[in-house]
Amino acid sequence: MNIKKFIVVVFLILSIKSYSQSWSPMSANNSIEKSYYIKKHNNSVGNTKVWVKLISNRIPYIDNNGVKKYTSGSELTLYNIDCNNSKIEIIKSILYDSSKKVIKTTEYNNWIDVAPETISEAILIKGCEIL
C-alpha cells in the first residue's frame, strides 16, 4: 500500500471515530424548554466519565455576588459514574450564554447516591449503557 492510500485510510478511520462520539439525546422526550444530551469522555475500571449538555432558554445560576440569575444557553457538566454502586460524582460544570461565552465554571468533588426518577438516575443509566 502506498503512503497516499495509507493516509486516506487513516483519515477515514479517524473521521468515523470522531463522528461516533457525537452527542446523543438523553431521552426521546426532550422539550423546547430543556434538552439533555450525553457524550462519553473516557472509561476507567468500573467507572465511566461522561459529559452531559443541557440546552435551555432558562438555566439558573448564582453569580459572583450570590444573586440568582438565569441565562439562555447551555451547560456542560462532567460526571464520573460508578455503575456498580449506583453513584455519580459531579466533577465540573461550565455554563455558556447563547453566544457561547463562558459565564461560570464550577469544580466539584462529591459523590452522590442516585435517587429514583431523577435526572441523576437518567445520567447513571445512560452513562452505564455507553460504558
Across the structure, where does each feature detected by a protein language model lie?
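Sec-dependent N-terminal signal peptides
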Residues: K5-L14
